[in-house]
Amino acid sequence: RECEDGYYSVVAMLTAMPIDMMVQLDDIGIDFTTIDEYDLFLLLVGTLKEQDTSLVFADLDLKRFQAAVNEQNGNIVLVDESSGVVIDRAIHAQIAGALRKIHHLEKDNRKPANGEAKEYMIERARKKMRRQRNRENASQLEELIVALVNTEQYHYGFEGTRELSIYQFNESVRQIIKKIDYDNKMHGIYAGTVSAKDLSQDDWNWLTHK
């Protein structure tokens, strides 16, 4: 369970958009609308170095990376001098993009319309954080695995599921949701409660999902 929590914490930090951490940024005096996701990543690197990132980066140790300035464009980058590996804005975007694809995460690019809306968003997010702090979090993966193993469309047992990668497991979840939704719509058509003409091309094809 600790390993799972640690993994998802690292994924959350690597894929975070400023709006995702507007409360934390506000607490240290940073307006979340004035920075981008790479700026946020650079702010979070110190915290990431304290985490076990091996499940994401394997043997690439973030502790060895130090901030440096790219002399060609003046941008701040992270450099591991022992290996010569550089993490810049483009590399971070690739890492975050890959993790979002694996976990089906959407980039949240929302910006408040004005200062009043921004304060309202921050206050709502702050209240939500307080509620979550008082709630004991169940294992996200465990709940999904138990649900799927007891679903007829899922053809793996508990042991078989352990052999799947995170990406394969998440794809299975989405595919099964799509198949169940398709079956329900087809039953609705035959029962006369769903109109076939109201269905889109995507609704008719359960083999793909977006």
Each model region followed by its residue ranges:
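Short coil/turn linker and secondary-structure boundary residues
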Residues: 60, 87-90, 136-139, 156, ...
